[in-house]
Amino acid sequence: VEMAKIGRPVLIRGNSCNGTGEKIRLYRDTMSGAGFSDQAVEESLNQLWVWREMHISETDDEAFDDFLLAHHSAYSYLEDVRAEWNPPEMEISIQRAPLGKDSYAKTPDPDVSESMVGGYKRVTEQVAMLQDVGVRNLMLTNRGLVSQDKANRSLRLLSEKIMPSFR
């Protein structure tokens, strides 16, 4: 909210698809309420980014099997590093643990904070849902410690099977 009041773009992390849409609307409304022109609001919305974890395979099960355990391992490692190195009096936002496979429904749920993980059809649907709630820019990372081959295959599927749908 404070960044919207001064017209600065932000990076939105985490949240469900619908939660992300709510944050974008709050940002837009706050910026408008602070007296910025419609053009200035649009320019800032064009510079607003949403950060998601991503892993794509041919099928949902393959992606879940490749990524989720590796993502949990990376999460645990980072939590250990934070506990060791962050000063105890330092206030930091607590990172939410990644969802387990059983938390992913057959189709993406816009009210659950899902990573963008699955077969390319599922992830295409997730990108479309984010676009529908106002996301214009996505920063996608692969936090799981998957092999270089699997990461490269995921990126290839992103560029060949998903991105052409959104050009």
Q: Model-derived features: where do they sit?
A:
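Short catalytic/ligand-binding loop motif for oxyanion handling, primarily in non-cytosolic enzymes
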Residues: V1, T20, E58, Q148-D149
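A conserved active-site cap/scaffold subdomain adjacent to cofactor or substrate pockets
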Residues: V1-R28
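Hydrophobic faces of well-ordered beta-strands that scaffold small-molecule active sites
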Residues: R8-R13, N46-E53, L138-N142
